[in-house]
């Protein structure tokens, strides 16, 4: 093989630059690299007693150098494909026009904020630890997901501002929208139990009452609600925080945003599959390397921006300045080129929360109504135990949490 191929999209261009510090070129050429391949020390069991992590053992797949070379090569190939267009053509509405940082350009190299990369489906073993109380570990259970796209970045303040303008103009999600019609014969995510199959039903209009602005009554409703939760990344007017991930958004608003933007909330199985690297079942989205405290792999432990925070912190950050612009941890690149799958803000998912897995699971979701919904990925305040793709938290869907954000998924 010749010299390292150049990356063909901004996300992977930046990833290739960052990973060059740990010999990404050698990985592409098939030469094993200890950082990409993992080693016995780094592949030790994840400490589940860390802050916001549960107890129990964690078995992780050993990433070989060859697998990692394929991963980076695949990321380049996937990133070279066009980002999805919404129905009728054009980019997703949150990134339409020339909105500048946080709207049309994200990350240090100015990627399209709406880049959405293909996650190639497959089967993996689900074994989660859960929070916020910790201590619960579910037994292993297989799950299969079909191909889907997962956005490269968490939703930014700038992108959400476009959504606020749309709701101010009267937009609300249509009844039944947000269903993953690409799976299960067009019926969407399913749950099989006691001889019956239940399918997702999409947006319920009664949920609009749980949004900040249910009737398009004015942008001021959003300002009041989003700023009640502190520290909030939202500002009433555009400013220096447009590239920060939006936090303090509740589940209903997260779901509505993704519908408006031409996508949907990923299921718990889909999100976990992407974060674990599919069948590789990585310890962290990037592999087995310890994330350290220099904000290169993940924004966590109140370490941002100077790396001088408190490892395994339990929520001592008190300012939006402790939350990083999306894409600020370049070595945290997931198998399919997503960034910030661990840390910064946790990501709200479609499923209701349950201690038991949906089984069997083929494009499944927990559809039995409950008082909480699943969130995954850890946040800027968590300890290292919550950076695993297996970690899950749960929150009431109307709750605003300063650690919580959203990332959308899309049809392949």
Predicted features by range, described:
Residues 23-105, 133:
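Ser/Thr-rich, Pro/Gly/Ala-heavy low-complexity intrinsically disordered linkers and tails
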Residues 118-119, 125, 200, 204, ...:
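Functional-site microenvironments in short loops/helix caps that host divalent-cation chemistry
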Residues 23, 93, 104, 111-112, ...:
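Extracellular secreted precursors and ectodomains with disulfide-bonded cysteine-rich loops/domains
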Residues 1-23:
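Sec-dependent bacterial lipoprotein signal peptides
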Residues 401-412:
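Short, structured beta-strand segments at or near domain termini in extracellular proteins/domains
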